[in-house]
């Protein structure tokens, strides 16, 4: 998929201003390439010339449309959610206004409905004239936002990130505020290589007419280009894998150096409510310019916003924190609470609809049962004072967690300098409740030595060998990550314990609920605890002294759950593109449609013609 994601666009050339400022023709390029990186030239770039004053120019529309892929169902509505219309004229006016501000380190300054970090004003460059946008290129259509590259008449380049309308307005605003503050913290407090943010807007009431982040453009290649996770063991392979794992592990190590005073997410001081402004986020700040810069507010972890559009904000606010550092169990319970409330809200809407689908009602009812079980067991999952867990108190302290630490979000700016991007959804939580970065995480059966752990491996057919080799390579990569964690933070290595992984699995599975039937994985992880519960109680690993398992399951219920889980897994692996939610890269979609593999139905959706697939099976795209 990387080759698809890293499509190229033509190198930007400056264009001459045509007439007076505000009337010149801006160049809009709709070609796609990876976020904030340079790529080889492409002859497929689609250039659009438009006057900034002509806000109704129909040529602009395609510049804002989602083009990176299509969906098998509800394609039009999903693309509509991903339209990123903004004011091109307003952008150039806003940027010039920033240039007139004094450069100093202070709280973000309100400007025409947006907020400016004036200390980063130098990103605009210098000119005796007005700062003007010369060209705009669409360089990446991501999972949560679209990225545009802005070229100025000063020769400087910026990135404009526009979020998709996938969440409520309140959720989008909170996520933007927290991401900018987190980026600012990483830069100013920890001195890490992250893009500097120039300005941000949390809604459409600004000159750009859209929520946005305007930040530094970082040139370079993605670290992902060096990631080859399934290479056979060799000295060269070990070196290649470490070239990717090491810088990310070092970045995490620096993040873990700060212990916070609460669980939640980072914001600027003025972006949290008054009752939270008196509480410093961490102790020991000696720089007066930073002592009142950040505060801890409600968590923006994705489970508090994902698929919560129909849940009242007042209910969400009851469960998204912040929480006191002395109460880590509240972090566990909050996820069960929010998912249970969300399921109950959906059931109420279904019950109020006379024409509701009975299958939907049955599905939601089962979800409610699972999240009631999760709510019951969450306070007991891990004993935060257990003597059997090494450095348990350290593991439960509040630390910053970035969910998208990934080589796709690392730009190699030079041979020795890596820049990290994308801090959406970052949260402060106990380290013991975090998961490994997805590029190294592996939840399957572990194989540490092919010949010792797999009986008869040498005599197997090649295809069967490859299946076990895949499991071995995934195990190897995760172990390499754990070795790096142990090297930098031996005091936190207990997170690698298989028992800790099993105990926190219900919580992590709940965090990963995306589709209606994903509750089955949550229930399965709870059921898994039953066999070991007595041993966990005896060793004080769980927060309970009762050897009786907290959830009472009947044999009939367990059989039904196992059957439904097996059916769902079979449905997932046998349904083309189910892993991507029915999303297909646009070039592949067009090809499959031309081949007759994808056929449009009467309701405007698409179905896969099985016989055509057998003739010419498509490759599965990676989840976007």
Curated annotation (Swiss-Prot):
Name used for this protein in its record: Altered inheritance of mitochondria protein 9, mitochondrial
SUPFAM superfamilies: Protein kinase-like (PK-like)
Superkingdom field: Eukaryota
Transmembrane portions of the chain: none
Compartments it resides in: Mitochondrion
Boundaries of the annotated transit peptide in chain numbering: 1-34
GO CC terms of this entry: mitochondrion
Family indicated by similarity: Belongs to the AIM9 family.
Chief location: mitochondrion
Record keywords: Mitochondrion, Transit peptide
Listed InterPro entries: Kinase-like_dom_sf, Mito_inheritance_9
Gene3D superfamilies: Phosphorylase Kinase, domain 1
